[in-house]
Amino acid sequence: MSGRPNNPMLHAALWYAELGYSAFPCAPGRKTPLTEHGLLEATTDTEQITTWWTQHPDANIAVRTDGLVVIDIDGEGNAWLADDTAKQADLGIAPQSLTPRGGRHYFFRQPDSHAWRNTAGRLAPHVDTRANGGYVLVAPSVVEGKPYSWQAEHELSMPPQRLPEPPAWLIEQLEALAASNGIVADGTPGNAIPTGQRNETLARLAGAMRRVGMSQAEIFAALQQVNADRCTPPLPLREV
């Protein structure tokens, strides 16, 4: 990066953009976007990024998470992860960002034909997800006087398309949450559930929804929508 101004935030923002992550500036020390349209202005354009961080050299760096799913675990010792070594190992394949309050961000890419959005506390208490329509701050951004940083040996070093997919059990739970929010599918052929897979897929989704604490009524309502939107053709109601 020789020849660039001696500005650590600018250098980092350009590095993320060169990897393929769309960035935009947030207020120094905060998570609030500095640009009028926030994440909608996220870009990999190096000229625009240079302009932003030349004007606001201390601005934090936000990365748009469309096409990604970032598992946002709040605080140290979160019960969802602390005592589960298998889960820790599964998540450990992903780049990991350490947050100022002792939490972690695990960076995955969304599998093909999925279209997940953000969730807050739905996966587990104090566990959020950032996906389509979301963003996260990245190192070396600073909040409350403390920086974000990359976990040693788990730094972000690959473009978005080379990030790992979530483990299978996590995909099931995220799909279940998407179903409960009415945002499972975008209607593309890749999201269709063909004859021969409908019952098995709905049963799998029902089990995943149950594991994330949804009620029987919520599960039934979500399955009806999945059946109507994705099953080709839809199953009779009595089979849902």
Placement of each model-derived feature along the sequence:
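Metal-dependent DNA replication initiation modules
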Residues: 57, 61, 77-175, 220-240
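Signature for HUH/AEP ssDNA processing cores
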Residues: 1-102, 111, 192-199, 214-220
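Generic, low-specificity signal for short hydrophobic/alpha-helical stretches with a mild N-terminal bias
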Residues: 53, 120, 152, 187-188, ...
